[in-house]
From Swiss-Prot:
Alphabetical list of CDD domains matching this protein: ABC_ModC_like
EC top class named in words: translocase
One GO cellular component term: plasma membrane
Protein name, as recorded: Molybdate/tungstate import ATP-binding protein WtpC
PANTHER family linked to this entry: SPERMIDINE/PUTRESCINE IMPORT ATP-BINDING PROTEIN POTA (PTHR42781), SPERMIDINE_PUTRESCINE IMPORT ATP-BINDING PROTEIN POTA (PTHR42781:SF4)
Species in which this protein is naturally found: Pyrococcus furiosus (strain ATCC 43587 / DSM 3638 / JCM 8422 / Vc1)
Length: 344
């Protein structure tokens, strides 16, 4: 088990603040946050590349805070993969084993085994410059795993890949983990990677680890408005709660639980259903709305709605936009279930 206890670090204009969490053996732990949150600095401290100003890193109960990287039993895959350009793929993968003075026959056996699992055995004679981004990523992961580390650290491993390759390698990473059973800390800004790969997640914002928990629990129940906004709860509404009803001006919103006094709620845009007529639905919150803006957001369309002078944002598909004849100024109905609401 890896334990990070109260790690702090001032780095240029950045401050990592009292970071604590643990990773169990066999766990895939995601550190999720925006660019500049301090994710890479945290990984480099765990890897031993830079020292912390305070706090400890323990591996299986042993304090490794001041140990050099090569004595930690930890493998680190940086974002740029850091492959040796003058070496073949075989020699890149074998590098850590050679440093550890593993016998040549054992090196060859382990390199062939890991390259078979990762699907790169046919590339062993090649140089890194002749490889695609996805192939380089596989080589970097193979080089890390072949030394059989206690834990592997992955810094935005899919960030430099195009969408199709990234999606394929995420699925392959699941398979590699099943077959090899490794423990990992994976830092990313991608919700897709977090949801697809993680057992637990730590949300990192402005140098602080602000929430840690099971992936689905954190995504559905953020512990603060700050976390909710980062996780896509674009609709944050403040009002006065009286039992299971929130009063927001003329609006009455049914809540999923009893509350009293001034509270805030969060609703994801994808949880709001749009229709041009009032429809039969189990949703207890159905409101007439006016479309104020229409914005393309990749495969979806975001609608900005005015509901009794309250702004709501909702997603619909392009085909639904056309089929419903929705345009700016049109009146529609917006509905959402009480269970889709998160109360802060």
């Amino acid at each position: 088990m890896l334990e990070v206890q109260g790690i702090s670090k001032k780095w240029k204009d950045f401050h990592l603040k009292d970071i604590s969490f643990s990773v169990m053996d066999g766990e895939y732990f995601i550190v999720l946050g925006p660019s500049g949150a301090g994710k890479t600095v945290l990984l480099e401290i765990i890897a031993g590349i830079i020292p912390p100003d305070g706090g400890k890193v323990l591996l299986d109960g042993k304090d490794i805070t001041l140990l050099p990287p090569e004595k930690r039993g930890i493998a680190y895959v940086p974002q740029n993969y850091a492959l040796f350009p003058n070496m073949s793929v075989f020699d890149n993968i074998a590098f850590g084993l050679k440093v550890r003075r593993v016998p040549r026959s054992e090196i060859e056996k382990r390199v062939l085994e890991i390259s078979e699992v990762l699907g790169i055995r046919h590339l062993l004679h090649r140089k890194p410059r002749t490889l695609s981004g996805g192939e380089q990523q596989r080589v970097a992961v193979a080089r890390a795993l072949v030394i059989e580390p206690e834990i592997i650290l992955l810094d935005e491993p899919f960030a430099n890949l195009d969408v199709q390759i990234r999606s394929r390698l995420i699925n392959e990473m699941k398979r590699w983990r099943r077959e090899l059973g490794f423990t990992a800390i994976h830092v990313t800004h991608s919700f897709e990677e977090a949801l697809a790969l993680g057992d637990r997640v730590g949300i990192m914002l402005n140098g602080k680890l602000v929430q840690v928990g099971e992936i689905r629990e954190v995504f559905s129940r953020p512990n603060s408005e700050e976390v909710a906004k980062f996780l896509g709860f674009e609709n944050i509404i403040e009002g006065i709660a009286d039992g299971r009803v929130l009063h927001v001006g003329k609006l009455r919103i049914e809540l999923p639980l009893e509350a009293k006094g001034r509270v805030r709620i969060g609703i994801r845009p994808e949880d709001i259903l749009i229709s041009t007529e009032r429809i039969k639905t189990s949703a207890r919150n159905v409101f007439k709305a006016k479309v104020e803006a229409i914005e393309d957001v990749g495969p979806l369309v975001k609608l900005t709605l005015n509901v009794c002078d309250i702004t709501l944002r909702a997603f619909i598909t392009r085909s639904s936009l056309v089929e419903l004849g929705i345009e700016e100024g049109k009146e529609v109905y917006a509905s959402f279930k009480a269970s889709a609401i998160h109360v802060f």
